[in-house]
């Protein structure tokens, strides 16, 4: 039986684009307390009632609510219209780093992975609208866009944004980077955009803005993952630029393979260790 690992996603000519939340939907909801949002809605409805006849003033609110209810009913009874299932891969999958030739081979857990957490906290009543936050956020965004354009050069496997929920304010934003090796993260740390961001931060010393990072380094047999009925996430979003073995053309190969492959069914097996 062929126990070699096969990628679940077809190779692509360019890095795959995944569904992402808009900047507004990612940041804005947590900038206001629920009571504030309700009060804003009540104020807008009051204004409509003051300038329009009652039977017309209720139309916007009722329309939005009706669309939401009907959409939910449709997605529940017609699964093919369920937007929440977009890009979901059914079954058990795991992330394995492909080799330079684009194949995953037979040996799990091969290759090193460096996980780098880079985050920012905005400890201010104005949240992302606080002093210096616009400039710092723009610099973070510029770094993100630059590293995505140069994924192969900088050894980036995957990146994903997260928002912390340890506080009601949701004022912590975390960027999770997955690099191929230590050399890759060193290269990223010495990039001009990274240095310029630190220079700006150190010059202005905004006490209400916190910046943090964490680094985790793994070697062969030091990483393992399991995703069940998930869209590509975390290291499962990883991609490596390789040369096609048949015609030598460049392509991007993903990390996701089936976890039901005989050699990947257990925790130890996915680490490349004997049971």
From Swiss-Prot:
Q: What is this protein called?
A: Monooxygenase af470
Extract the InterPro entries matched here.
Monooxy_af470
Query: Which Pfam families does this one have?
Result: Monooxy_af470-like
Q: What is its EC number?
A: 1.13.1.-
Q: Which UniProt keywords apply?
A: Monooxygenase, Oxidoreductase
Following inactivation of the gene, the phenotype reported is:
Completely abolishes the production of fumagillin but leads to the accumulation of the intermediate prefumagillin.
The induction field says: Expression is controlled by the fumagillin biosynthesis cluster regulator fumR. Expression is also under the control of the developmental and secondary metabolism regulator veA.
Q: Which reaction does it catalyse?
A: prefumagillin + NADPH + 2 O2 = fumagillin + acetaldehyde + NADP(+) + H2O
Origin species? Aspergillus fumigatus (strain ATCC MYA-4609 / CBS 101355 / FGSC A1100 / Af293) (Neosartorya fumigata)
- Top-level EC class, please? oxidoreductase
- What are the GO BP annotations of this UniProt entry? fumagillin biosynthetic process; terpenoid biosynthetic process
Tell me, what does this protein do in biology?
Monooxygenase; part of the gene cluster that mediates the biosynthesis of fumagillin, a meroterpenoid that has numerous biological activities including irreversible inhibition of human type 2 methionine aminopeptidase (METAP2). Within the pathway, the monooxygenase af470 catalyzes the oxidative cleavage of prefumagillin to yield the final compound of the pathway, fumagillin. The pathway begins with the conversion of farnesyl pyrophosphate (FPP) to beta-trans-bergamotene by the membrane-bound beta-trans-bergamotene synthase af520.
Please provide, alphabetically and separated by semicolons, the GO molecular function terms listed in this UniProt record.
monooxygenase activity
Biotechnology comment: Fumagillin and its derivatives have been intensely studied for their potential use in the treatment of amebiasis, microsporidiosis and rheumatoid arthritis. They have also interesting antiangiogenic properties by the irreversible inhibition of human type 2 methionine aminopeptidase (METAP2).
Per the record, the pathway is: Secondary metabolite biosynthesis; terpenoid biosynthesis
